[in-house]
Amino acid sequence: MKRLPNNPGVYRMFNSDGGVLYVGKARNLKKRVSNYARGIGHSNRITRMIRETVTMEFVVTRTETEALLLEANLIKRLRPRFNVLMRDDKSFPYILLTGGHRAPGIFKHRGARSRKGDYFGPFASAGAVGRTINALQRAFLLRTCTDSVFETRTRPCLLYQIKRCSAPCTYEISDEDYAGLVAEAKAFLSGKSQSVKDHLAAAMQAASADLDFEHAAVYRDRLAALSHVQSHQGINPQTVEEADVFAIHQEGGMTCIQVFFFRTGQNWGNRAYFPKADSSLGPAEVLGAFLSQFYDDKPCPKLVLLSETVEEQSLITEALSTRAGHKVQVSVPQRGEKKELVQHALTNAREALGRRLAETSSQARLLQGLAETFGLPRAPRRIEVYDNSHIMGTNAVGGMIVAGPEGFVKNQYRKFNIRSTDITPGDDFGMMREVIERRFSRLVKEHGTPAGEVKNPDAFPAWPDVILIDGGQGQVGAVRQILGEMGISDLVTAIGIAKGVDREAGRERFFMEGKQPFTLPPRDPVLYFIQRLRDEAHRFAIGTHRARRKKEIVRNPLDEIAGIGPTRKRALLHHFGTAKAVSRAAVEDLMQIDGISEAMARAIHDHFRDK
């Protein structure tokens, strides 16, 4: 301890197994560790943490702000047991208006901003983005097809017929007029909604005055679509241009933080978070820790409104400003419209936490009921459900969904593209065998056996207590055999669900090792629970299969050629128009394109001639 510096920095506390218990930051590392060492005046949580700590590691930083940023990054990456943890850290969706194309498209986008274009967001959910894009299609008639589909169209698609697209692909609209629609969409998404609506209203009146009622009806429908967007946005504040609103509510040992997003003066939705935090921590501590992590990989607006004054608020403000590259104001409003926004968020936080507490209580009863029904030693903490999806063996996929004490755990869902070439098309049995082998081989490799998880009871387990599979005694026996070959058959309970007579819900038969098949009473809550798990697995597997099939359908033939990336493909399609025209081109013609060497031109030419 004597060698510790009096500098700001970050410290990590480890238990006897090398697991990270806690990540913290300090203005003075020496004083902070000395405070821990005194062992008096600590809360029960801190006392437990110190008792389990056997070693510590330190990183000295230049400033306390730098320490706060590093701490947030390490907490999100290491997920220590005693820190406040964000449970749902899925990236936010955006609306993307693509650039670098004669006819920009409008798309939902999630993840890194690698594509050229204008991004609008964040939106709170994919559903909010979908509804907005749906309405914007009707209002501005922008395309939503991929570039590869766009380049190969020879006639307008159905969306043109139902007035959801202006068909720039086949020049049903001029590039100049389409650019005008794109500019209007950008203006609307940038907060100039009233000027766009005024322009459309004026155009409608002018068309009506000229007795051009057909065009007047088009403008009327576009205005209605924009009004539909705004009606779904709820509160649209007049004095708040860009802000995120955070409100926290604690009850029953749980915490809910409700976040509302306002951009360009419009409400772009909200999302409820239920961070993992010790029940001894108050709202100011939890909200401060949450805020430090929240913007680690997200853009921060100029204004952040809070329902509580958080610990080290000035330091957090400085850290957010540093990360965002612009000045960020963090405040707790006391009056006016901003106060109303916070109160609205707080009301939503209370309601969301109330629903969560009721759902958690119900889920606990169902898990206990499942344990009693199937003779399990305790209520399962992790259930995995498997299902396959394919059409005559093509684009075959397996899906795994996960459920626990708090419902479905979607960040644990997994997709499996069936790789085996020796599986007969439509062989569900063989597909399930591959999925189970791959899942548990990786589980053993990454986590060892379940014995190591007992030491951290607060963490969501990596190993399932129960796996549910679609099938009867044969499927259960096969799964048990696979697990037995891996030496883990005694660690997991496998349950088969066979559809009832005429595939009627409520008449399912259940199969377990060493037991006779049995059914459950039609109104048994456990039966409904299992049906819900099975239906979720089915939904997930079918969705995965459809996505893979769609990708196969829209795949451009140029994607099959080694060395043809997005840039070369775009250059070829820009010059020749379609992939079919590229396939007919001579080597000399291909060499005229920038970036296409003679060797590449011959590779393209030979690829299509060899087919």
Curated annotation (Swiss-Prot):
Annotated keywords: Cytoplasm, DNA damage, DNA excision, DNA repair, Excision nuclease, SOS response
InterPro entries: GIY-YIG_endonuc, GIY-YIG_endonuc_sf, GIY-YIG_UvrC_Cho, Hlx-hairpin-Hlx_DNA-bd_motif, RuvA_2-like, UVR_dom, UVR_dom_sf, UvrABC_protein_C
Predominant location: cytoplasm
Subcellular location(s) of the protein: Cytoplasm
The GIY-YIG domain, residue ranges: 6-84
GO molecular function per UniProt: DNA binding; excinuclease ABC activity
Function: The UvrABC repair system catalyzes the recognition and processing of DNA lesions. UvrC both incises the 5' and 3' sides of the lesion. The N-terminal half is responsible for the 3' incision and the C-terminal half is responsible for the 5' incision.
Family to which the UniProt record says this protein belongs: Belongs to the UvrC family.
UniProt protein name: UvrABC system protein C
UniProt source species: Brucella abortus (strain 2308)
Lineage: Bacteria, Pseudomonadati, Pseudomonadota, Alphaproteobacteria, Hyphomicrobiales
Encoding gene, per UniProt annotation: uvrC
